[in-house]
Amino acid sequence: MKITVLGAGSWGTTLAVLLAGKGASVRLWAHRPEFARELEASHENVRYLPGVTIPDSIRIEDDIVRAVQGASIIVTAVPSQALRETLALFRDVSLSDTIIVNVAKGIELDTGKRLSEVIPEVLPAVSPAQVAVLYGPSHAEEVSDKQPTTVVAASSCLETAEKVQEAFHTSMFRVYVNTDIIGVEIAGSVKNIIAIAAGISDGIGYGDNAKAAIITRGLAEMSRLAVSLGGEPMTVSGLSGIGDLVVTCLSRHSRNRYLGEQIGKGRSLEEVISHMNMVAEGVSTTKAVFSLSSRLGVDMPITSAVYEMLFENKPAEQAILDLMTREPKKELGY
C-alpha cells in the first residue's frame, strides 16, 4: 500500500515511521526543500522528533504533487490553518480512489468549518465518504517510543474508517472506528482550548480541584457544541473526547497546556508563541470556536474565558473569578 504523509512535524514523522514499520510504501512530504534535504541526509527529525530514526524505506519529498500521486491514503499532518492552502497545491491530481486522513485538530478560522469539511471543498474529486480523521490521546513522543496508545478513526463512511483502522493498527497502536466524524472532530478540537485553561490554572498555582473542574466542565462544553452541530453526545465520552482531554490537560508533552501555564504565570501570548517551535492549535481554535459558539448560541463559558485571556488581555485570576461567580446552574443538561 502506498501512503503519503503531508507534514514532517513530530506527528507526521511519527505516523510515517509507524506505517513504514507495517510494510507500507511511505512518502513523507516536507514543506521546505531545505528541511526535506536535512531529513534525507540525517535520517532523523532533529527539530521536532529528536532521537527517532527515519528508516531508509521512507521516501522524503519536497514536491507535493509527486508525493501524492498514486497514493492509496494521504495523511494530512499540517497545522489546521494551513490545511486549505496545502490541499490546493494538488487539487488537480486524480484522487477518485484515495482516502484522505486528517490528523490535525482544529476548526478553520475564516469559515468555522471542520477540517473534514474543508477537504472535499478544496479537492473536488474527493467525496465526504473518502475523508476520515485519526484522533485520540496520542503524543508523538510516546507513540514513537512504541508505548501503548489507542485512537479512533472516524468517517461518515464505515468502510473508509475500517480501511484506516487496518492501515494504522499495530500491537501498540490500537485503532477503533466511529462514524460520528462530527463529534470526534469537535471533541478533538475543543480539548485544546480546555487544555489551555488547565495550563492557566497550573500557572496561577491552583491545585487538583481546579484542574478537575476545568476538565469536567470543559467536557460539558465539548458535548454541547458537538450536539448542536449534529454530533452524538456519547462520542465525547470516547477517545477523541475525554481520552484526549485528560492527556492534553495533564501531560508535560502538551503544547496547549504549556502555553496556558505560561499565560497563567503572566507572560503575554505573543511572548509565549515566539519561544515555541511547534504550533499550539488551541490558540486559533479558541478564536474559531468562540465565534462559532456565539453564532450558534451555545453556552461555552470556559472557552469564552480563554478567549478573553488570550485576545482581550483579561487577567487570568479575574477570568477564573468571573467563571466561579456566574449564576448557579444545574449540573447536567444542554
From Swiss-Prot:
Pfam families: NAD_Gly3P_dh_C, NAD_Gly3P_dh_N. NADPH binds at residues 10-11, 31-32, 105, 140, 255, 279, 281. GO terms for cellular component: cytosol. The active site is at residue 191. The keyword Cell membrane does not apply. Belongs to the NAD-dependent glycerol-3-phosphate dehydrogenase family. This is Glycerol-3-phosphate dehydrogenase [NAD(P)+].
